[in-house]
């Protein structure tokens, strides 16, 4: 039984995956097991809307940095996207050419602002949501 894979082994393997590989893994798991990773979020949103009148709105703590365009400096934007995300050249190029697409999701306000600044310095446009 020494050949069994532990949870720690799975987590270590997942840590080494790129964002694109993780996205494909999530889609595969959703299809294979007939579930949706977005379902808990939808339930939380409905519950949050019901309780919103009673409680003041909470400050948003997680933001998405969405690449909306690359201007005339596509190569420079690809280089910055690679540096930020750790993606390979092809994956970063596909992300940039497929804009609008998220560069990073669920990051702090400071990190999202930093990403926006770096992309805009090389001529791209980013929207923080």
UniProtKB/Swiss-Prot annotation:
The gene is rplL. The keyword Ribonucleoprotein applies. It comes from the Bacteria. GO terms for cellular component: cytosolic large ribosomal subunit. Forms part of the ribosomal stalk which helps the ribosome interact with GTP-bound translation factors. Is thus essential for accurate translation. HAMAP family: Ribosomal_bL12 (MF_00368). Belongs to the bacterial ribosomal protein bL12 family. Homodimer. Part of the ribosomal stalk of the 50S ribosomal subunit. Forms a multimeric L10(L12)X complex, where L10 forms an elongated spine to which 2 to 4 L12 dimers bind in a sequential fashion. Binds GTP-bound translation factors. PANTHER family: 39S RIBOSOMAL PROTEIN L12, LARGE RIBOSOMAL SUBUNIT PROTEIN BL12M. Keywords: Ribonucleoprotein, Ribosomal protein. It comes from Syntrophus aciditrophicus (strain SB). One of its GO terms (molecular function) is structural constituent of ribosome. GO terms for biological process: translation. The keyword Nuclease does not apply. This is Large ribosomal subunit protein bL12. SUPFAM superfamilies: ClpS-like (SSF54736), Ribosomal protein L7/12, oligomerisation (N-terminal) domain (SSF48300).
